[in-house]
Regions:
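Transmembrane helix-loop-helix
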Residues: 1-61, 65, 97, 102
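Alpha-helical transmembrane bundle and helix-membrane interface signal
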Residues: 12-13, 61-75, 115-128
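Alpha-helical transmembrane segments of integral membrane proteins
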Residues: 18-22, 72, 76-80, 102, ...
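Small-residue-rich segments of transmembrane alpha-helices in multi-pass membrane proteins
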Residues: 27-28, 53-56, 78-86, 131-136
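Contiguous hydrophobic segments
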Residues: 53, 59-62, 71-79, 147-158
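Membrane-embedded catalytic cores of phosphoryl/pyrophosphoryl-handling enzymes
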Residues: 67-90
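C-terminal transmembrane module of polytopic alpha-helical membrane proteins
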Residues: 86-158
Length: 158
């Protein structure tokens, strides 16, 4: 229910296409963080990392507006929700806090990129360059982690 209201606001800020890109890319980055930094004997599933990514994008958007009353109010609200959710994530053993943090960090980058940066043509393509960079870093991390795991004597079949 919380994501429905928060997600609707974020979609209104960035539009449907960018919102979908933020959700999918940050979900991928969150899963990557879980895989790269998690123990070998665990498997993370769920959409909470992508939801944290949307939170991160909302925060990035409002960080640029922190000198306005509305921007500061939005940052306080989002910050409180994130803090509460992170306390829960770290406190409950079955919650994958690595995915939550990975999604949040990716969301901050995605939100900054989705709004655009630079001038002229660069600004026009900036959202997609930023999303592509997140995916590229995630893929590099997956390849690196998989290579490390394959080198372990317990996993010769990977």
């Amino acid at each position: 229910m919380l994501f429905r209201s928060f997600g609707t606001m974020t979609e209104g800020i960035f539009g449907q296409r960018r919102f979908l890109a933020i959700y999918l890319v940050t979900g991928f980055a969150a899963s990557t963080a879980s895989y790269v930094f998690g123990p070998l004997d665990s498997l993370g599933v769920g959409a909470s990392g992508a939801i944290f990514g949307v939170f991160g994008a909302f925060i990035a958007y409002n960080l640029r507006r922190r000198n306005t009353v509305q921007g500061m109010a939005a940052l306080r609200w989002a910050g409180t929700l994130i803090l509460l959710n992170l306390v829960i994530a770290f406190g409950v053993r079955s919650v994958d806090w690595r995915a939550h943090l990975g999604g949040l960090v990716a969301g901050l980058v995605a939100g900054w990129a989705a709004e655009g940066f630079g001038k002229g043509e660069v600004r026009r393509y900036a959202p997609w360059i930023g999303m592509g960079a997140i995916v590229a870093v995630s893929l590099f991390a997956i390849v690196t982690r998989t290579t490390e795991i394959r080198a372990l004597p317990l996993f010769p079949y990977l």
